[in-house]
Amino acid sequence: MNPSTAQARVIVDELVRNTVSHVVLCPGSRNAPLSLALYDAAAEGKLRLHVRIDERGAAFLAVGMAARTGRPVAVVCTSGTAAANFHPAVLEADRAGVPLIVLTADRPPELRAAGANQVIEQQRLYGGAVRYFDEMAVAERRSGQNAYWRSQICRAWNAAYGEWRCGPVHLNVPFREPLVPDGSEDWFESLEGRPGGARWTELPDFGALPAFVVPSARQGLVLACDTGVRAASEWAEQHGWPVVAETGGLGLGGATAIGSGAWLLAVEKFIATHKPEQVLCIGRPTVFRQVQGLLADPDVEVLLVRPDSDWPSPAHNVRQVGQWFDEPTKPADPDWLASWQAADAAAAAAVRATMADEAWPTGLGLAGELVRALPPEALLVVGSSNPARDIALAGGPRPDILVHRNRGVAGIDGMVSTAIGAATVHRGHSYALIGDLTFLHDANGLLTGPAESRPDLTIVVVNDDGGGIFTLLEQGAPAHSAGFERVFGTPHGADLGALCAGYRVPHVVARTPSEFREALRPEPGLRVVEVRVDRSRHRGLHARLRAAVSAAVPG
């Protein structure tokens, strides 16, 4: 057996022993030893192999799977720019705390500084975005390497998952030729792992920060983000605290859930009389400025739940950080909760009444219709930009829905691949809500070979022909209208149906509410539902909704 084959087989075997069950592979020559070892392991049922030809999409596919399962997923590529294309997904995994094991093949050292083809500097390619980096020694025809190879895989897995802060790790693996098996199975020593399929190195469960934050307010507010929404909702229900989520009503349940929280926090007269003494924040809020404003208020004590020591606090106003909320030291004020509930009902009614007068379709209206149509226990992947805001503002209460958002660095890239990855490991129907630019940015994520599985995923594309989010920001003010379309609106006129046809993905344009509802019925396989909206209406609609909510909510 040649050294590259031996090393690759051991690496794959130890990944399996470390509970890695999904691996995304990008084809190439230099990573051929790993490719063949992964194929054999998949054929034996030891792992599921997903093959993609676009490295950027492949890495985001792995992010989606790892985020949904909470377990490390490995992604493998050849040398050169292939490795560089993993970088956006590595950055997202870093900031979102997603366990990702990146394996990049490389030329051996004697070729890298000698003008060899397809060579870049892959050592520490991802900088500080990875929890751990190692360049493995080039495999050689000698004994004593099995323990080294297996030990390094255990180190990488532990850094990705086993310590306080989950995230990406990077192993750069130089391979010398020959890169394919030579027909011999002989080696200098046993290449077996520990008996019983155990890891080479058993590691302790490091857990999270060994501390609890201690709520001590009678008039407090729970702010839930990302994967902590359901747990935060349960805690709030148990202790009588109002709870607001960045996902609106998705994942929130119980009488203390405030589905209109994003609207209420933007009503100045309401917050003036309903400023909480403490905010118990779980996760990392990123969407709304009114949320950041509350967390920055020096009169509000912020207690943050975070499973690692890298806590988000742009305003530098966090008082405590811990792994969970302890029992509160004081009983909640029932009148405080009742006032939030009354305001929530008034805001929701104002939004419904205003939306009823709007011509179909709007992004906000589509978000609400989608949420109502989702089957029980569905997964909803929400794109950045307007969809993240539309879901929070118009989604409505659905405590049974699972939500995933790429809010680590909140980019629009890789969302199609992320959604496919998350749907691949979700046991149930899956949906995605994304904008047209997000869809176009990762349309190559639709490309799957005939041997690859396609999940049951409906991708809803809200097509406003450009950057609709900018109409809601400062750039969308009338004072900047002269250059808006060229540098912010960026209309494209792309034919999404023709694009989908090229990838052999079913596509439909929903032109009426009934067509939209029909298109959302659960169906097997991957499909795209497009709805075309007029982004020139965004700014005015949001202004009318803010005014309606402000008028309906008491101070």
Predicted features and spans:
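Thiamine diphosphate
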Residues: P99, L103, E110-G127, D390, ...
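Active-site nucleophile and cofactor-binding loops and adjacent substrate-binding regions
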Residues: L25-S29, L49-F60, V75-T81, G383-S384, ...
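Active-site diphosphate/adenylate-binding microenvironment
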Residues: A8-I11, S29-L34, L38, Q341-R427
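Glycine-rich, anion-gripping cofactor-binding loops and their flanking helix/strand elements
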Residues: N85, L209-V214, L221-P314, G396-G428, ...
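Phosphate/pyrophosphate-binding active-site segments
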Residues: Q292-N386, D495, R511-E518, P522-G555
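Glycine-rich, acidic loop regions that bind phosphate or pyrophosphate groups
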Residues: T104-A156, A245-A348, G449, E474, ...
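A short, small-residue-rich loop immediately preceding and capping a beta-strand
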Residues: S21-L25, K46-H50, R68-R107, K275-G283, ...
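Structural signature of the thiamine diphosphate
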Residues: H22, R68-C77, A83, E92-V98, ...
